[in-house]
Amino acid sequence: MRKTPKNLESLHKFAEAYAKLSRTYFCIDQSITALVIEGLARHKDDYGAPLCPCRHYENKKTEVLAAYWNCPCVPMRERKECHCMLFLQPSNEFSGESQLISKDDLQKHLS
């Protein structure tokens, strides 16, 4: 069993709040939502910022300082384009109908 990131709860709350703020929705597949939130929390633990976990970086520390891919990333803020499929526009075929994921569902998909 993996160790739970210490920032999991704060990134969980952030994701729900930002989905509401941006009028986007979580993926219909809750395992994607859970894994992305976990990845953001791990990067926050390791690098001090929620760097997008769905991209490859030559140097994560440099990317954190550049801030372009820190969540919410520039493409998300400017065009509502989330590479990770965490924040989806309602018209996206993978968009669910929820801006919330329960703590139990989050943990279930991370176990």
From Swiss-Prot:
Any single GO molecular-function term of the entry would be:
4 iron, 4 sulfur cluster binding
Q: Which GO terms describe its cellular component?
A: chloroplast
Question: Where is [4Fe-4S] cluster bound in this sequence?
Answer: C52, C71, C73, C82
Task: Show the disulfide pairing.
Answer: C54-C84
Question: Any idea which residues are catalytic in this one?
Answer: C54
| Keyword Oxidoreductase among UniProt keywords | yes
Cofactor info, note text: Binds 1 [4Fe-4S] cluster.
Predominantly, its location class is plastid
> Which residue ranges run through the membrane?
none
In the UniProt record, the signal sequence range is none
Provide the alphabetized UniProt keywords: 4Fe-4S, Chloroplast, Disulfide bond, Iron, Iron-sulfur, Metal-binding, Oxidoreductase, Plastid, Redox-active center
What Gene3D superfamilies would the database entry show? Ferredoxin thioredoxin reductase catalytic beta subunit
InterPro entries assigned to the protein according to its UniProt record, in alphabetical order: FTR_bsu, FTR_bsu_Cyanobacter, FTR_bsu_sf
Enzymatic reactions: [thioredoxin]-disulfide + 2 reduced [2Fe-2S]-[ferredoxin] + 2 H(+) = [thioredoxin]-dithiol + 2 oxidized [2Fe-2S]-[ferredoxin]
Q: Where is this site: Increases the nucleophilicity of the active site Cys?
A: H83
The record's similarity note reads: Belongs to the ferredoxin thioredoxin reductase beta subunit family.
Q: How does it assemble?
A: Heterodimer of subunit A (variable subunit) and subunit B (catalytic subunit). Heterodimeric FTR forms a complex with ferredoxin and thioredoxin.
**Name of protein:** Ferredoxin-thioredoxin reductase, catalytic chain
The UniProt gene name for this protein comes to: ftrB
